[in-house]
């Protein structure tokens, strides 16, 4: 590989490290955007089948070109800025929403050595960068100078902060048993132990000893992304479309892309942190990216399944679930895991 790249390295000279990093960024973001586009089609198809409908089937064979048509439509639509809006902040809102969604992928490993930035504080970076997104939502709601976007953005801020706390405590449990903030090390730590040696690798993954945290993390991830049944932020019957009411064209599309990119991010993080990432469930099958993609696809299906199945929760119920149920459970489980690790019954020695 190095021999093949040698002429290119000589061509760019001192600029090669920057060019190589940029190439890796494009290699992550381009497929991600394609996945986001076709996730919208998958969502419409899955929900259609659940409601005994066909879903999109007109644009291209079996409707496969529908996401391209939707993207082109949004690309050529005018971005209308309301008269009373703060124009600079109005445009900044969608950018602040999508930037953290893309930046978070820098520390996500796709396989052994397949990561853009293999930093030791990857988990901490993820917590920090994903919490920035709420500022984009708040700015969008405030800059629109309209009551519905403002109400929606306040709801979003309260909801995202509430569930970030529970997710943070769930991640502390993962940190305790993995003894590392590096996501690659967390996956490696799930590939060892008695069950792994017996060939039943899936029994050594974190989802079994941390099952309550696994459920809390997944549900909190759905709430963090403002997806149904936690979509009170854009409840059509209450606040029309929340903070996105006044947006059109590509400005609206950026919020849309951020939401679906976050869905994929939460799904892949759940796979990496709790179900072994790219590790094979049984020892006689090889590890690889295929397993990570399969697990991520399953969790994405859970997102779509939840949307098609559950009615929207009332806002006070969502707040109560976050503060009075999830946070106490995660706090107790952090203590349980810490005591369990110190006891003679520890399974992590």
Curated annotation (Swiss-Prot):
GO terms for cellular component: plasma membrane. One of its GO terms (biological process) is aerobic respiration. One of its GO terms (molecular function) is oxidoreductase activity, acting on NAD(P)H, quinone or similar compound as acceptor. It is found in: Cell inner membrane. It is a multi-pass membrane protein. It holds the Pfam family NADHdh. PROSITE patterns: COMPLEX1_ND1_1, COMPLEX1_ND1_2. It catalyses: a quinone + NADH + 5 H(+)(in) = a quinol + NAD(+) + 4 H(+)(out). PANTHER family: NADH DEHYDROGENASE SUBUNIT 1, NADH-UBIQUINONE OXIDOREDUCTASE CHAIN 1. NDH-1 shuttles electrons from NADH, via FMN and iron-sulfur (Fe-S) centers, to quinones in the respiratory chain. The immediate electron acceptor for the enzyme in this species is believed to be ubiquinone. Couples the redox reaction to proton translocation (for every two electrons transferred, four hydrogen ions are translocated across the cytoplasmic membrane), and thus conserves the redox energy in a proton gradient. This subunit may bind ubiquinone. This is NADH-quinone oxidoreductase subunit H. It comes from Aromatoleum aromaticum (strain DSM 19018 / LMG 30748 / EbN1) (Azoarcus sp. (strain EbN1)). The gene is nuoH.
């Amino acid at each position: 590989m190095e021999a093949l790249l040698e002429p290119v390295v000589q061509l760019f000279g001192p600029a090669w490290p920057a060019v190589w990093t940029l190439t890796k960024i494009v290699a992550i973001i381009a497929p991600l955007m394609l996945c986001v586009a076709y996730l919208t089609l998958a969502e419409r198809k899955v929900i259609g089948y659940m409601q005994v409908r066909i879903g999109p089937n007109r644009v291209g064979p079996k409707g496969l070109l529908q996401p391209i048509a939707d993207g082109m439509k949004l690309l050529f639509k005018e971005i209308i800025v309301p008269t009373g809006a703060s124009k600079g902040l109005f445009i900044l809102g969608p950018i602040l929403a999508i930037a953290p969604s893309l930046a978070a992928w820098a520390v996500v490993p796709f396989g052994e050595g397949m990561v853009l930035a293999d930093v030791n504080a990857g988990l901490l970076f993820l917590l920090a960068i994903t919490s920035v997104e709420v500022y984009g939502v708040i700015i969008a709601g405030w800059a629109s100078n309209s009551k519905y976007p403002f109400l929606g953005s306040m709801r979003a801020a309260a909801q995202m902060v509430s569930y970030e706390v529970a997710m943070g405590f769930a991640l502390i449990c993962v940190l305790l048993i993995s003894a590392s903030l590096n996501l690659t090390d967390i996956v490696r730590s799930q590939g060892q132990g008695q069950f792994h040696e017996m060939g039943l690798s899936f029994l050594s993954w974190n989802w079994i000893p941390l099952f309550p945290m696994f459920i809390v993390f997944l549900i909190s991830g759905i709430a963090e992304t403002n997806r149904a049944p936690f979509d009170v932020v854009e409840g059509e019957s209450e606040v029309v479309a929340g903070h996105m009411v006044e947006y059109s064209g590509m400005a609206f599309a950026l919020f849309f892309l951020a939401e679906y990119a976050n869905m994929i991010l939460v799904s892949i993080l759940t796979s990496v942190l709790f179900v072994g990432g790219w590790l094979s469930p049984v020892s006689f099958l090889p590890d690889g990216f295929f397993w990570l993609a399969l697990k991520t696809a399953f969790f994405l299906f859970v997102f779509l399944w939840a949307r098609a199945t559950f009615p929207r929760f009332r806002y006070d119920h969502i707040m109560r679930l976050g503060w009075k149920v999830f946070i106490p459970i995660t706090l107790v489980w952090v203590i349980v895991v810490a005591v369990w690790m110190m006891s003679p019954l520890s399974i992590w020695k």
